[in-house]
Amino acid sequence: MMSAAPSPDPSLDNEWKEWKTTFAKAYSLDEERHRRLMWEENKKKIEAHNADYERGKTSFYMGLNQFSDLTPEEFRTNCCGSSMCRGEMAPDLPEYEDLGKNSYLTPGRAQPE
């Protein structure tokens, strides 16, 4: 007996359409179902995380974004090519620099009381 492949949740149709419009997403007929199911899975993970946030178990809130239709592998492959994603944010910066020494900073203006 074969199990049926998952089907998109019809109660999310309007939210899915709004998300696609917001992020200018368009898919071929073949890809639409796959992207919708991935989006729904990511939405559930986000909602579970945010429930933990509301209970004080995590320190940040999550939301749907332009990457919400990607698998984790697709995100890593397509969106994490930058040095920031690899943990190399600024390897050549000095540990400390006095910005006032080279006049990078100017004195503050007088503020009314």
Curated annotation (Swiss-Prot):
SMART domains: Inhibitor_I29
Keywords: Repeat
Any Pfam family matching the protein: Inhibitor_I29
Origin superkingdom: Eukaryota
Molecular function terms, GO-annotated: cysteine-type endopeptidase inhibitor activity
InterPro entries named among the record's database cross-references: Papain-like_cys_pep_sf, Prot_inhib_I29
Span list, region 2 X 3 AA tandem repeats of E-W-K: 15-20
Family that this chain belongs to: To the propeptide regions of cysteine proteases.
Protein name (database record): Protein CTLA-2-beta
Organism annotation: Mus musculus (Mouse)
